[in-house]
């Protein structure tokens, strides 16, 4: 087995829905383990919460407000000692829509 130039591949995943994020992480872990690479993680990172407060009406009733929030869930994982087969399998992997993936070699 030939190894890739780096010792690890760091993958950072972001999504609004944690269930979709966990499915994507499970697919990546299964793919990496099936090709003989080690996996460290997934490590749950702190969730970013963006809160927005708006008036319910246009003119009056300043006391009547509505709050919305947007949560961004994140996971971090390392693939240790990846082979060329691991990199090829990860490139062909189709993840669910709504998952943002950042890969650092």
UniProtKB/Swiss-Prot annotation:
Species the sequence originates in: Nitratidesulfovibrio vulgaris (strain DSM 19637 / Miyazaki F)
Quaternary structure note: Part of the 30S ribosomal subunit.
SUPFAM superfamilies on file: Ribosomal protein S10
Signal peptide positions (record): none
Listed name of the protein: Small ribosomal subunit protein uS10
Gene: rpsJ
Gene Ontology MF: a single term: structural constituent of ribosome
HAMAP family per the UniProt record, alphabetical: Ribosomal_uS10
Listed GO biological process terms: translation
